[in-house]
UniProtKB/Swiss-Prot annotation:
One of its GO terms (biological process) is iron-sulfur cluster assembly. It comes from Staphylococcus saprophyticus subsp. saprophyticus (strain ATCC 15305 / DSM 20229 / NCIMB 8711 / NCTC 7292 / S-41). InterPro entries: Fe-S_cluster_assembly_SufBD, SUF_FeS_clus_asmbl_SufB, SUF_FeS_clus_asmbl_SufBD_core, SUF_FeS_clus_asmbl_SufBD_sf, SufBD_N. SUPFAM superfamilies: Stabilizer of iron transporter SufD. NCBIfam families: sufB. Belongs to the iron-sulfur cluster assembly SufBD family. This is Iron-sulfur cluster assembly SufBD family protein SSP1857.
Amino acid sequence: MAKKAPDVGNYQYGFHDEDVSIFRSERGLTENIVREISNMKEEPEWMLNYRLKSLKQFYKMPMPQWGGDLSELDFDDITYYVKPSENTERSWDEVPEEIKRTFDKLGIPEAEQKYLAGVSAQYESEVVYHNMEKELEDKGIIFKDTDSALRENEELFKQYFSTVVPAADNKFSALNSAVWSGGSFIYVPKNIKLDTPLQAYFRINSENMGQFERTLIIADEGASVNYVEGCTAPVYSTSSLHSAVVEIIVHKDAHVRYTTIQNWANNVYNLVTKRTLVYENGNMEWVDGNLGSKLTMKYPNCVLMGEGAKGSTLSIAFAGKGQVQDAGAKMIHKAPNTSSTIVSKSISKDGGKVVYRGIVHFGRKAKGARSNIECDTLILDNESTSDTIPYNEVFNDNISLEHEAKVSKVSEEQLFYLMSRGISEEEATEMIVMGFIEPFTKELPMEYAVEMNRLIKFEMEGSIG
């Protein structure tokens, strides 16, 4: 059995609703469960075979011996598939009332009405609501849940699925490949530039639940898309598992920005594989906000395949009591004149632990490639810790690599300066933290910047005394 989760304090999205699911698999991971998931979804035979092969791969692979402590994660105590409703609705009014109330509390309809081009909401294992502006459909943009894409766009789906993150990549990508459900599928045709964000929202509601969405984004030549996802879960005494796979293909001269704002409860293991292939003069941006969870292990990866390809990761990690944020980035330079940037901001308080773990690789063909890495950590008390673990591989002597790492505490001089102007110690500390994360929040859409600042302020409550 999974052990009792650590104290979660006043986590604001910790409410949970009565179980209204129409189907729930038995706990534990077996071949029968995998077949049941595929059968429920009425999938083609090739996908069932892919799932079963992935399950065998999962059993063969050992648990990671690096990163956070996974010893309490019990795969036999997890529910791998929960179907919350019969259909994916295109009208908000048609979403089941109990589920709608949850997303109303989280502001999903409000956010859509304000500025989103399309929105998808996943509850447990399935997308329960999906909508996109008609003018985008008229341009040939495909934005739907991944299960629908498999049914309705099978040829395009099969062309790209599992080409970026194969099942055998790691133990948790194998697990996802065996039991994946939901997620987003996006295809943007050649030279179509979408400035307004597409959004997906992922919510775990049940105890001991596993959520395994699979997201696949293809930006064709000269295309551009901005995708934003948000994640929350209730507070329970036992652990839940979120293990997603994200695959992105950025074709020649295309641009993708992928923004994540996660605020999981302290009983969630968040173990995610994100990777993109970036071709000639393409540009990939990861903007990654990591709050909450018991343990996060996530390292967005750019494989720079074509000359002039660019990749960047801008991340923030906040670890409080009982939390470990083991996050970072990977930049793989495979072509000439490629460039990458990693900016990592980490904050730890109340005994939390933050780890930056990154890889920058320069291949033999990466002549003229360059990479810049900046890791800044702010530690708010004597109980909290931080580690920086960079790993650089260089197989070409014509490259440029810069790495800067800095760990600091809130200084008495900073506090004295602010407090001498009538500001309390708690408010002064909050101001210093908000200034520290400003390079991250300024890259977010306005509504998300406001929400991120609010979440950080919420995490900061009670930091003094």
